[in-house]
UniProtKB/Swiss-Prot annotation:
The gene is nrdR. It comes from the Bacteria. Residues 49-139 form the ATP-cone domain. GO terms for molecular function: ATP binding; DNA binding; zinc ion binding. Pfam families: ATP-cone (PF03477), Zn_ribbon_NrdR (PF22811). Belongs to the NrdR family. The keyword Coiled coil does not apply. This is Transcriptional repressor NrdR. Its cofactor is Zn(2+).
Length: 157
C-alpha cells in the first residue's frame, strides 16, 4: 500500500485487529522508506442495490445523503449522531438482506420515516414534510392529527 506521507509504494503491516462488530479489520502500517506509521481499514464491499429515483434515474445508494437528510430533520432535537448512524446501518442491512438489485427511493424514504416516527415525532414531521412534499399547512395538520390519534402527545413549553 502506498504511504500517505511520502508516496512510497512499500509498507508493512505491524498490527491487525478485528473491528468491534467483526465486519472490518484495522491495520497499523509502517512505511519502509520514511518509517512513519498510519492506519488503514479493510471491510467487505457492501452489495447495496441501485436506487430508482422518482424520475426513473438510477444511482448508487449514498449513505452520506441519507444521514444528511436525517440530520436535517433532527436538527436541534435530542437525537445523537450515533442514533442516526444506527438507523442508516439498519437500513443498509435491510437493503443487503433483501437481495434486490434495484429498489425504489420511496421504500428508503418510508423506512426512514418509520424509524423517525418511533424516535422523535418532530423529526418525523420535518422529514415527512420534505419526503411527502407537503404543499400547505393543512397537510402538516393532517399529519399531526394522525400522530395525535396514534397516542402521540403535545406538551406545553
Amino acid at each position: 500500500m502506498k504511504c500517505p506521507f511520502c508516496g512510497f509504494a512499500d509498507t508493512r503491516v505491524i498490527d491487525s485487529r478485528l473491528g468491534k462488530e467483526g465486519n472490518n479489520i484495522r491495520r497499523r502500517r509502517e512505511c519502509s522508506q520514511c518509517e512513519r506509521r498510519f492506519t488503514t481499514f479493510e471491510r467487505v464491499e457492501d452489495m447495496l442495490p441501485l436506487i430508482i429515483k422518482k424520475d426513473a434515474r438510477r444511482q448508487p445508494f449514498d449513505r452520506k445523503k441519507v444521514i444528511g437528510g436525517i440530520q436535517r430533520a433532527c436538527e436541534k432535537r435530542p437525537v445523537s449522531i450515533a442514533t442516526i448512524e444506527k438507523i442508516v446501518d439498519t437500513l443498509e442491512r435491510q437493503l443487503q438482506e433483501s437481495g434486490e438489485r434495484e429498489i425504489e427511493s420511496k421504500i428508503i424514504g418510508q423506512a426512514v420515516m418509520d424509524a423517525l416516527h418511533d424516535l422523535d415525532q418532530v423529526a418525523y414531521v420535518r422529514f415527512a414534510s420534505v419526503y411527502r412534499q407537503f404543499k400547505d399547512i393543512n397537510e402538516f395538520m393532517a399529519e399531526l392529527k394522525d400522530i395525535l390519534a396514534e397516542g402521540g402527545n403535545v406538551r406545553d413549553n
